[in-house]
Structures are given as structure tokens and as C-alpha cells.
């Protein structure tokens, strides 16, 4: 994992640590309600149209996902924290299927954190990973990649 955070910015370090702990507890350890109670503020604003506002809604959404998908997990490839903002480049695996060869969904999550280090706002950009030989598996699965660079 690549981490970009000023070690002298204690707020940014704490916020980065809290986002990593949120992912671990909510998705990898399947304790979403506990995770959101600890790391998400009650006034949480969600910009992903699939999930309602509020920490309870986030906990319920991922609780349902992880109860249905025992293999669900997240791999954090990059994380950047500056002040109240944390950006994470992640790969969500087995959120939507149980395929052991699932390539998952790539995401960039952006969190705004409050003074207590809890997430109070979230944006994301999501993209299917798909076959690494294809350029755009969600639009044109038969178009070959134009470069050898991986998604992560």
C-alpha cells in the first residue's frame, strides 16, 4: 500500500488510520454496524446514490452485503490524507458475487472527516476491473487494452 500523509499532521494521520480501520471492520471483518458506530458520524452525507445518508444506513447497507458475501473484502492500494480529507484507491472484491476469481470493482473513495476523526461525508468513483486484457469491460469488453499498465 502506498501512503501519502504528512507524519507531522496528527489529524491527517488519525483520519487515515480511521478510514483504514473502517474498511477493515466494516468489510473485511464483517462488523459493519460496529464499524459505522465507531468511525462514521451521525450526520454522515452519502453521495453514492445506492446508499442513504446517515451512519446507520451505511452500516445496514454493508451489513446486508457482507452477510450475503462471506468472501467480501477490500484491498487498499493507495491512501492520501490531508487535514480533514482522505482519498483511498481501493479494490472491492466479492461484493457482488462469490467467484474466487472475481477481479472486483476499483474505487476511489473520498472522505471528509470531522474534528473527532469520524467520516461525515463520502464520495466515490467506481469502475469494474474485469479482464486485464480488455480496456473497458463495462462498455466494450472486446476492445483490447491500449497499454500494459494495470488498474492498480
Predicted regions and their residues:
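C-terminal and inter-domain tail/linker signature
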Residues: 1-152
Amino acid at each position: 500500500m502506498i501512503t501519502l500523509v504528512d507524519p507531522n499532521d496528527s489529524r491527517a494521520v488519525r483520519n487515515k488510520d480511521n478510514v483504514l480501520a473502517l474498511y477493515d471492520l466494516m468489510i473485511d471483518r464483517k462488523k459493519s454496524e460496529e464499524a459505522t458506530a465507531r468511525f462514521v458520524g451521525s450526520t454522515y452525507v452519502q453521495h453514492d446514490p445506492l446508499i442513504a445518508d446517515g451512519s446507520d444506513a451505511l452500516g445496514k447497507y454493508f451489513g446486508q452485503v457482507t452477510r450475503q458475501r462471506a468472501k467480501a473484502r477490500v484491498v487498499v492500494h493507495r491512501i492520501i490524507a490531508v487535514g480533514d480529507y482522505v482519498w483511498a484507491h481501493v479494490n472491492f472484491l466479492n461484493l457482488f458475487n462469490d467467484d474466487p476469481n472475481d477481479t472486483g470493482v476499483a474505487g476511489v473513495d473520498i472522505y471528509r472527516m470531522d474534528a473527532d476523526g469520524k467520516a461525515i461525508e463520502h464520495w466515490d468513483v467506481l469502475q469494474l476491473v474485469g479482464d486485464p486484457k480488455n480496456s473497458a469491460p463495462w462498455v466494450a469488453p472486446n476492445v483490447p487494452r491500449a497499454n500494459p499498465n494495470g488498474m492498480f
